[in-house]
Amino acid sequence: MKNNEFDFLYYVYKNGLDGYRKIAQSTNISLGVISKLANKFKEIEALDEKGLTPKGIELLKPYKVDNAIIMAAGMSSRFVPLSLEMPKGLLKVKDEILIERQIKQLHEAGINDITLVLGYKKEMFFYLEKKYNVKIIINPEYNVKNNCETLYLARNILKNTYICSSDDYFTENVFDEYVYTSYYASIHVEEKSDEWYMIKNNKNEIIKVNKFGNDGDIMLGHVYWNHEFSEKFRELLIKHHELGDYDDSLWEQLFTDNIKKLPPMQVKTYPSDVIFEFDSLDELRRFDEKYVKNTPSKIINNICRLFNCSANEITDFKPIKEGLTNTSFIFKLNDKLYVYRHPGDGTENIINRKHEKKSLELAKKLNVDPTFIYMDEKEGWKVSEYVKNVRIPDYHNFEDTKRILKVLRELHEHNLTVDWEFLPWEEALKIEDLLNAKDPSTMRNFLPLKEKIAKLVEAVKGDGIEKRFCHCDTYAPNWMLTDNETILIDWEYSGNADPGCDLGAYIMDAMYEVEETEKFISEYLQ
């Protein structure tokens, strides 16, 4: 079936045969062609005076949408702080929950077979299964793989399928019960951005995708795959899942790299006021004024209480790369930048926040960490000053090493003590127990190393080293170097310990050879 034949039949299916001129205006097909199409379909008894006959509906059958997949596994880290408290798809925008609005729009279009692929805070979505009769697939690797994994997990249900993101907002219903061919939704922009720009041929088919651009049709919103496209893309998903070379990639990257091997996908351009994706709280505030004065966020409320400010004064949220145990973001207040540290799930099992707070206060007093402002010892959140133009030390730059060791030497020479200890061996055994409880197989390769460390622990017990206040987690990411300052941050594991812990943590992460280690220790002992 040709495109204009499909457009004619689908229009009549939805609206009836309500005048050739109106059909021509709505489908952008000339009046003469509409007349010819009507005569053609009447001749084969696909059309009568009322509209499509059963035979006409049968002609549309290959183009009927089978189902929809809504991707909702990721954390949406750019959407801090709200994404730290709930998945972005569950935000209420214009008084409707994003993913619920999308499910209802799919239902209105006659698409009832809907599957959600979940990961981050998945339990918060489970109510949708009963409320809207949706199906659920769990992506357990959402935090280490990108959405190629999500689609791989859903590979067996790829047919005539809508691929949607849970956090899109459509001001009008963009879904159809029947679709002619595969397409990627788009809006046309005339300014430079970091979006993905689709280059198309004279058939409106995507022939190339550029990351970044000055103007053009950008990838934005939902996607539709027909049976042919789904079959070929499923083969790619299976192949590259085995190779693992696209684990960190968006599915669009896999598409971009294989455009010439895949069935055609068109660009479907919408007006700029139809499709919205909110990449930050600031963008959402511009769309929904409710979030300006009353942002429903415990984190925002924490900041407001600390600084005695209103929510609309807090702006410019930017995520910082996730740490091993926590997630942090930058925010601006009164033209000054700060860092908010949000404790990771489960960290209460390995970190004593009361001890951490006392350590931070002591480190600030010693000017080892002058950035500290406040920490809530019950909930574990922390606010610090943001330091511009910082870098971490280069393990193989000895000038950096000397700066690090000067700070550690001075810290140890204070010979301070606190009322708790950090015991590396005992703490490691606690973490081992936690990991074993979750998945015993993760520790198999650790046992030979554990036996060696156990002997070392016994050997150093008789050293007679006087314990004192130490940081105990001195690897490079916990240092901030400026032209004039050497700052040691993140005191979660601090306490009374052998000062060798502070040297050993740095040496271990640097993976120094014996000669470099001896040089490092000699510099410390000067």
Label every model-predicted segment.
Residues 7, 171-246:
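Conserved core of the sugar-phosphate nucleotidyltransferase
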Residues 318-332, 339-340, 455-501, 515:
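Active-site acidic catalytic loop and adjacent metal/ATP-binding pocket
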